[in-house]
Amino acid sequence: MDAITPKGTLKADEHSHVVRPADMDWKPTRFPGCEVKTLLMDPKTGIMTALMRFAPGAVLPDHEHVNIEQTYVLEGRLVDKEGPAEGIEAKQGEFIWREPGSRHSAWTPEGGLMLAIFQIPNKFYEKDGRVTDSSGQIWDEVWGRIGKD
């Protein structure tokens, strides 16, 4: 994060961080057809900004946005597959944000590329009843403390 530094005590590279996504490799996620380039991740707060690339037909399964989630669609479209907003879609050049507590699954019929901003990682609802983060860790164990310290 960037902030005004009192009396200019820090060098530019100590408070401004340039990320070069073109020089980064796509990392697979546990969700088939979904890859990510993490541009910012703060493990203390859960804030994350990522480029997400989806293959045609890829599904992001049942999940809840614990806080506001923001997505800008760079390519393709993102469609709610299930949930209260089933069928709503954001197309290339459109921006969609979701309120805290919103829950759905989403898919990309033709594939897509998104810039996603999370204030805290999503909760994924597994078929066996566990609630996990995107890496498969138990959400409460990793992220449940945030905002309670």
What positions do the PLM features span?
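Short histidine-centered beta-strand/loop micro-motifs
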Residues: A50-M52, L60-H65, E82, G87-I88, ...
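A short, N-terminal "cap"/entry segment at the start of jelly-roll beta-barrel domains
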Residues: M1-G46, R130-D149
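Short acidic-glycine-tyrosine-enriched beta hairpin
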Residues: K81-R103
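Conserved catalytic motifs of the protein kinase core domain
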Residues: I47, E69, G111
